[in-house]
C-alpha cells in the first residue's frame, strides 16, 4: 500500500503472545493516523467465521499513547508506587544525560536498574540482579509501579517487576520489552528527564534500601564452584582502573551482571548478536 503511513498485519490469535503482538500492531496503525502530520493507515486483519455468539464480554485491550516534546500537556508521574528507570544497552552517556537522570531519581525516589551494557554510572545505579533472581523468596523492593525504559536490547535476564512502562526514545517506535507498554515519548532522553525533574530534590530512600538488601544477599553467597560466576566474583575487584571490559554473550554477560563493576570501569557487549546462534 503506497499511500498508507503505516501498514500492519494482524494474524489469528492462538495464545497470549499473539494477543500481545496484535495489540502492539493495532496501536501502531492507529498512532500513525496522527504522526508527522497524519495520514491513512492500513490494517490487514486475518479473520475466521464462527456461529458461536455466546461471548458477552471481550478482554480489555490497552491503548498506547505517543507524546512529543511539543505537547502542551504531559502525563503526570503516578504517585502510587515505586518508580524505576530501566536502561538496556546504551550508547556512551554524556554528563548532561547522567545529571538529568540523577535529578529525576532524586525527585521521585527512583533507582536506575542497570546491567553491564547500560553504560550509566550515576548516583542511582543499582545492580540488583541478585535480589531480582530469587525464586524461593520475593523482596517487596523487587516490584515497582512504573518503569521508564531507555536503551535497546538488554542482556539482563533478571529485572524488577513493574505494572506498566513508559518508553523514551527519539524514534518514537513501539517497543514493548516488558509486555506492559502504555506510553511512548518521542524525544531525546535528556528532554524527558529534565521536564519531570525538580530542583533541590534529594530522595534516596529506595536506592539505599535496595542496596542494603543487595549487600545482605552478597554476604550470604556460599563458596561457588569453579564457573563463570566464580570467575566474575574473584576478578571484579581486581580490574585495573579506567579499563573497558568487553563481554561475550550470553553466559559471560549474565554471570558478570551479578556483580557491580568498580566506579570508572565501563563495559560493552555485542548484544546485537542475540538470536543468531
Where are these regions (language model features)?
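A short, well-structured juxtamembrane/interface segment
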Residues: 68-77, 95-98, 138, 223-238, ...
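Phosphate/pyrophosphate-binding active-site segments
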Residues: 162-253
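Glycine-rich phosphate/diphosphate-binding loops that line cofactor/substrate pockets in enzymes
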Residues: 30-37, 73-83, 104, 235-241
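Structural signature of the thiamine diphosphate
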Residues: 8-60, 138-165
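Glycine-rich beta-alpha junction loops
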Residues: 45-51, 89-91, 117-118, 172, ...
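Glycine-rich, anion-gripping cofactor-binding loops and their flanking helix/strand elements
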Residues: 87-166, 262-277
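Acidic-glycine-rich active-site phosphate/pyrophosphate-binding loop
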Residues: 246-266
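Short acidic-hydrophobic, aromatic-tinged amphipathic segments that line or gate anion-handling sites
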Residues: 6-13, 127-135, 182-197
